[in-house]
UniProtKB/Swiss-Prot annotation:
GO terms for cellular component: cytoplasm; nucleus. It is found in: Cytoplasm; Nucleus. Gene3D superfamilies: Nascent polypeptide-associated complex domain. The gene is EGD1. The keyword Cytoplasm applies. Residues 36-101 form the NAC-A/B domain. It comes from Gibberella zeae (strain ATCC MYA-4620 / CBS 123657 / FGSC 9075 / NRRL 31084 / PH-1) (Wheat head blight fungus). This is Nascent polypeptide-associated complex subunit beta. Component of the nascent polypeptide-associated complex (NAC), a dynamic component of the ribosomal exit tunnel, protecting the emerging polypeptides from interaction with other cytoplasmic proteins to ensure appropriate nascent protein targeting. The NAC complex also promotes mitochondrial protein import by enhancing productive ribosome interactions with the outer mitochondrial membrane and blocks the inappropriate interaction of ribosomes translating non-secretory nascent polypeptides with translocation sites in the membrane of the endoplasmic reticulum. Residues 132-147 have a biased composition (Acidic residues). Its main location: cytoplasm.
């Protein structure tokens, strides 16, 4: 009987709910609070600037100095044109220029075109280096026909 009571005490120690005197309260694990207060402050500041939402913007790309791009897919954009202020909401992703190349060519300015040229030159240099290391491809010998049945010697 006392053996059973000891086992119950061991099990009960981990699950104290705070019903008796002197027992610590159980900690409630909470998710981190959302930044709702910051969003409200930002909305008030944008309202003071008289920003208007801009519809039908599919993507926003911000080009960084190191050649990478901050890419926003389907962002919310607010603008105050008289004060030259734009606010972009959404999840931004750091991407390399090569990841966005086919669709981003019409958005490139002179600085970005220079980085694209450097990227293309480095790619060509890599291709030249790979061309020099073609040890896997044998050279063709004149007068030999490799399309027929193999000759066993």
């Amino acid at each position: 009987m006392s053996d059973v009571q000891e086992r119950l005490k061991k099990l009960g120690l981990g699950a104290r709910t705070g019903t008796g005197k002197g027992t610590p309260r159980r900690k409630v694990k909470r998710a981190p609070a959302r930044s709702g207060a910051d969003d409200k402050k930002l909305q008030l500041a944008l309202k003071k600037l008289n920003t208007q939402p801009i519809q039908a913007i599919e993507e926003v790309n911000m080009f960084k100095q190191d050649g990478n791009v901050i890419h926003f897919a389907a962002p919310k954009v607010h603008a105050a044109v008289p004060s030259n202020t734009f606010a972009i909401y959404g999840n931004g992703e750091d991407k390399e220029l090569t990841e966005l190349v086919p669709g981003i060519l019409n958005q490139l300015g002179p600085d970005s075109l220079a980085s694209l040229r450097k990227l293309a030159e480095s790619y060509q240099n890599l291709q030249k280096e790979k061309g020099e290391d073609d040890d896997e491809i044998p050279d063709l010998v004149e007068g030999e026909n490799f399309e027929g049945e193999p000759k066993v010697e």
